[in-house]
From Swiss-Prot:
This is Acidic leucine-rich nuclear phosphoprotein 32 family member D. It comes from Homo sapiens. Disulfide bonds: none annotated. The gene is ANP32D. Transmembrane segments: none annotated. Belongs to the ANP32 family.
Length: 131
């Protein structure tokens, strides 16, 4: 199902500002980007986007209260630099199973001051000698 429709179903007659957890697993992203997710989800603390075909998270909206972001089993390799600005309170980030090949891709994650957990399982970057 298309991501925008999936979000509409997940709202269940609530406003975006009422939602603290959003599960978009296995929905379909259009052109590898997030769609239908806006900064109106201002109370969102958990976002699951597992296996939705993402290639970039560059258009992620500002989600100040987001603490846990699940991006596993996608094809994302660009856009990680927006996380520190858009999700400054992120504690857990799961990027396992993405197309992350070099350290420069994850370098911007150093700016996430509250990050406690980073999962890069099966990402090619973990095979580098200086990882």
């Amino acid at each position: 199902m298309e991501m925008g429709k999936w979000i509409h179903l997940e709202l269940r007659n609530r406003t975006p500002s009422d939602v603290k957890e959003l599960f978009l697993d296995n929905s379909q992203s259009n052109e590898g980007k997030l769609e239908g997710l806006t900064d109106e989800f201002e109370e969102l603390e958990l976002l699951n986007t597992i296996n939705i075909g993402l290639t970039s998270i560059a258009n992620l909206p500002k989600l100040n209260k987001l603490k846990k972001l699940e991006l596993s089993s996608n094809r994302a390799s660009v856009g990680l630099e927006v996380l520190a600005e858009k999700c400054p309170n992120l504690i857990h980030l799961n990027l396992s199973g993405n197309k992350i090949k070099d350290l420069s891709t994850i370098e911007p994650l150093k700016k996430l001051e509250n990050l406690e957990s980073l999962d890069l399982f099966t990402c090619e970057v973990t095979n580098l000698n200086n990882y």
